[in-house]
From Swiss-Prot:
<dbReference type="InterPro" id="IPR025777">
    <property type="entry name" value="GMPS_ATP_PPase_dom"/>
</dbReference>
<keyword id="KW-0658">Purine biosynthesis</keyword>
<dbReference type="GO" id="GO:0006177">
    <property type="term" value="P:GMP biosynthetic process"/>
</dbReference>
<dbReference type="GO" id="GO:0005829">
    <property type="term" value="C:cytosol"/>
</dbReference>
<dbReference type="InterPro" id="IPR014729">
    <property type="entry name" value="Rossmann-like_a/b/a_fold"/>
</dbReference>
<protein>
    <recommendedName>
        <fullName>GMP synthase [glutamine-hydrolyzing]</fullName>
        <ecNumber>6.3.5.2</ecNumber>
    </recommendedName>
</protein>
<feature type="domain" description="GMPS ATP-PPase">
    <location>
        <begin position="270"/>
        <end position="462"/>
    </location>
</feature>
<dbReference type="InterPro" id="IPR029062">
    <property type="entry name" value="Class_I_gatase-like"/>
</dbReference>
<dbReference type="Pfam" id="PF02540">
    <property type="entry name" value="NAD_synthase"/>
</dbReference>
<dbReference type="InterPro" id="IPR017926">
    <property type="entry name" value="GATASE"/>
</dbReference>
<dbReference type="Pfam" id="PF00117">
    <property type="entry name" value="GATase"/>
</dbReference>
<feature type="active site" description="Nucleophile">
    <location>
        <position position="156"/>
    </location>
</feature>
<keyword id="KW-0332">GMP biosynthesis</keyword>
<feature type="active site">
    <location>
        <position position="245"/>
    </location>
</feature>
<dbReference type="InterPro" id="IPR001674">
    <property type="entry name" value="GMP_synth_C"/>
</dbReference>
<dbReference type="InterPro" id="IPR022310">
    <property type="entry name" value="NAD/GMP_synthase"/>
</dbReference>
<comment type="subunit">
    <text>Homodimer.</text>
</comment>
C-alpha cells in the first residue's frame, strides 16, 4: 500500500561511543516474569525448570548457567559487568547501574578472568544466588578476577563467594534475615559515602559470613549479622549482605552510584542518544543496499525498531502486520495511523483471524494456545515475506531481558528458560539475517529511546501487551464471540483510566474474561452470564508488581459501563493480587 507521512530526521555527525558501562556476573537468572513483548512478533513458550532449594532466597530457582551476552562493539569504552549466580534481581542490578548513566552488562558466572581482562570493564558486580557457597557443586567464579585490579562488589551470595575465595568463612545461621532490617554503618567512606549512621536495608539470606580474613575490615552490621558489609584493605574488593538494588533499600541507588562512579571511575556520561547514533550507523554498515523486513504491531518495541531502521535505511524497509484476530480493539487502525504518520515505506497487512481461530478451536490449555499461535504466526509471516523481493534481513524487537532469559549465548552453552518470540523465533529456512538493534536495552530504555527518535508519547507509553495477545486474557477455549466480549470490556477499562488521567500512573491495565458464568438480575429477569476481571498494576520493572489502588468511583464507572454496554456480562471483579504470588497476566 502507498505510505504517506513525515520522514524522521537523519542523525547528524559520526556515532558517539558509549562512555560508561558495568558488568554483572550471572550464575543463571531464572526470572519468574515474561517481559511483555509485541503480540505480532513471536510466541513465548515457558519451559519447565526444576526448582532448587537454596539458602539465599532473593533468587530464582535455576541450577544452570546463564548466557554470556555477546559483546557489542559500540558499548565497550566503559562498562560494568554483572556476574549472575542465579539472582532473580540480576537484571535489576544492571538497570540500577544504568540509571547512573553507566552501561552495564550481565554475563555468566563462570566467565574466565582472561575474557574479563579482554573486555576491560571498569568494575565487576557479583550477584546473589540460591545456593550455599560451601556446598558441593555451588557455582563459583574464576578467582583470578580478584587479581585483575578491577574493583569488585559482591552482593549477598556474591559477597560470601568473594569472602570465601579470599580466606574468610561462610556458615548457615539460625538467625536468618528476610525483609527489612536496620543496618549500622561503621565505615561511611567510599561506597557508603553519604549514608546515615543507621539506615534501612533489605536482607534475604540464611547463610552469612562468620569470619573474615585479616585483610578485610567490617563496614556495617545489623543486630544479627556482624558482617553486613566488608572491604578488602589492599584490593578494591567490597561486599554487602543486603541488596542495594531493590527499592526496599531506600538509598541503595546511592551505594551503587558510589561504587561505579567513585570507586570504578566511570564518568556517568552514557546516553541513549549516543546509543541511537551508533545503532543507526551499525545498521547501515550491516545492511548496505539490501532490504529489511520488520514485524510491526504498534507496540513500543517494534515501533522503535522501525524508527531506527527508517532513519538508517529509509525506503529499504518493509513492514509486515499480521492481524491474528487476537488484538485489542481498533489495533489495526491505530497501527496504520501511527505508521502513516511516521514512516514513508511500504506496509504489508495479513488478515489471518480465521486461520488463527481455527487453529485454536477446542484448545483451553495456555501453553498449547501459545504454541499454536506461534506456529500460525510463523507460517503467516513466512508466506508474506516470500512476496517481498530482495529481502535479506529480518529485524526483531529483541530486548535485553529476552536475550538473558532465552539463553542466547555467543561464548558458550546456556540453558534456555523461555523460548522467546523475539529470540530465534522464525525458522532458519527463511534464510534471513537477523538485526536486533534493541538487544542491549531494557524496556524503560526503549521508551526513552523512542522519545529521542521523535515517536509520539501516546505510542511510546502504551501499556505492554502479551505476545499471544488476548488469547491469554480469554481463559479457557477461545471463540470469536468471547473475543468480542473481551475486546469491548478491555477498551472500556483503558478508556476510563485514560479519562481519569491515570493511564501514565499505572503500568498495565486490562480486562480478563473468566471461564465461568454467574447468576444476576437485569431488569426483572434472571441472567446467567459472563464474569469479567479487571487487572491493573503498578511496577517499576515488571519483576514485582502491586495492584493499583484505583479510586472507588473509577472502579464503579468501569463496572457499570461494562455491565451496561457489553452484552453477555453481568459481573465485574477487581483483581487485588500482587506479584508475587500472582503473575500480572492470568495465563
Amino acid at each position: 500500500m502507498p505510505a504517506t507521512g513525515i520522514t524522521l530526521p537523519s542523525p547528524s555527525g559520526p556515532p558517539l561511543p558509549c562512555s560508561a558501562a558495568i558488568f554483572v556476573l550471572d550464575h543463571r537468572s531464572r526470572l519468574p516474569w515474561p517481559f511483555p513483548v509485541s503480540p505480532l512478533l513471536f510466541y513465548t513458550a515457558a519451559l519447565a525448570f526444576p526448582a532448587i532449594s537454596g539458602k539465599n532466597t532473593m533468587t530464582s530457582s535455576a541450577n544452570t548457567t546463564s548466557p554470556a551476552i555477546a559483546e557489542t562493539t559500540w558499548l565497550t569504552d566503559q562498562r560494568i559487568l554483572v556476574l549472575d549466580f542465579g539472582s532473580q534481581y540480576a537484571q535489576l542490578i544492571a538497570r540500577r547501574v544504568r540509571e547512573q548513566n553507566v552501561y552495564c552488562q550481565i554475563v555468566r558466572h563462570d566467565i574466565s578472568a582472561e575474557r574479563i581482562a579482554e573486555l576491560a570493564p571498569k568494575g565487576i558486580i557479583l550477584s546473589g544466588g540460591p545456593n550455599s557457597v560451601y556446598e558441593e557443586g555451588a557455582p563459583k567464579c574464576d578467582e583470578g578476577l580478584f587479581d585483575l585490579g578491577i574493583p569488585v562488589l559482591g552482593i549477598c551470595y556474591g559477597m560470601q563467594l568473594a569472602c570465601q575465595a579470599l580466606g574468610g568463612k561462610v556458615d548457615n545461621t539460625p538467625s536468618r534475615e528476610y525483609g527489612r532490617a536496620m543496618c549500622e554503618f561503621t565505615d561511611r567512606d567510599s561506597i557508603f559515602r553519604g549514608m546515615q549512621e543507621s539506615e534501612q536495608v533489605w536482607m534475604s539470606h540464611g547463610d552469612q559470613v562468620s569470619q573474615i580474613a585479616d585483610q578485610f575490615t567490617a563496614m556495617a552490621k545489623t543486630s544479627t549479622c556482624p558482617y553486613a558489609a566488608i572491604r578488602h584493605n589492599e584490593r578494591p574488593v567490597f561486599g554487602m549482605q543486603f541488596h542495594p538494588e531493590v527499592t526496599h533499600t531506600p538509598h541503595g541507588g546511592q551505594i551503587l552510584r558510589n561504587f561505579v562512579i567513585d570507586v570504578c571511575g566511570c564518568d556517568g556520561s552514557w546516553k541513549l542518544g549516543d546509543f541511537a547514533d551508533a545503532a543507526i550507523e551499525s545498521i547501515r554498515k550491516q545492511v548496505g543496499n539490501k532490504r529489511v523486513i520488520c514485524g510491526l504491531s504498534g507496540g513500543v518495541d517494534s515501533s522503535v525498531v522501525a524508527a531506527l531502521l527508517y532513519k538508517a535505511i529509509g525506503p529499504q524497509l518493509s513492514c509486515i502486520l499480521v492481524d491474528n484476530g487476537l488484538l485489542r480493539k481498533n489495533e489495526q487502525q491505530i497501527v496504520l495511523e501511527e505508521f502513516s504518520n511516521h514512516f514513508k515505506t511500504d506496509l504489508h497487512i495479513v488478515e489471518a483471524e480465521d486461520r488463527f481461530l481455527a487453529d485454536l478451536a477446542g484448545i483451553d490449555e495456555p501453553q498449547e494456545k501459545r504454541r499454536r499461535i506461534g506456529h500460525a504466526f510463523i507460517e503467516c509471516f513466512k508466506d508474506e515475506a516470500a512476496k517481498i523481493e530482495d529481502a535479506h534481513f529480518l529485524a526483531q524487537g529483541t530486548l535485553y531481558p529476552d536475550v538473558i532469559e532465552s539463553g542466547a549465548d555467543k561464548d558458550g552453552p546456556a540453558a534456555t528458560i523461555k523460548l522467546h518470540h523475539n529470540v530465534g523465533g522464525l525458522p532458519e529456512e527463511l534464510g534471513f539475517e537477523l538485526i536486533e538493534p534493541l538487544r542491549d536495552l531494557f524496556k524503560d530504555e526503549v521508551r526513552r529511546l523512542g522519545l529521542e527518535l521523535g515517536l509520539p508519547e501516546q505510542l511510546v507509553w502504551r501499556h505492554p501487551f502479551p505476545g499471544p495477545g488476548l488469547a491469554v486474557r480469554c481463559l479457557g477455549e477461545i471463540t470469536r464471540d468471547k473475543l468480542v466480549v473481551l475486546r469491548e470490556a478491555d477498551a472500556i477499562v483503558v478508556e476510563e483510566i485514560e479519562n481519569a488521567g491515570l493511564y501514565r500512573e499505572t503500568s498495565q491495565a486490562f480486562a480478563v474474561l473468566l471461564p465461568v458464568q454467574s447468576v444476576g438480575v437485569m431488569g426483572d429477569a434472571r441472567t446467567y452470564d459472563n464474569a469479567v476481571a479487571v487487572r491493573c498494576v503498578n511496577t517499576d520493572d515488571f519483576m514485582t508488581a502491586d495492584w493499583s489502588h484505583l479510586p472507588y468511583e473509577l472502579l464503579a464507572r468501569i463496572s457499570t459501563r461494562i455491565i451496561n454496554e457489553v452484552k453477555g456480562v453481568n459481573r465485574v471483579c477487581y483483581d487485588i493480587s500482587s506479584k508475587p504470588p500472582a503473575t500480572i497476566e492470568w495465563e
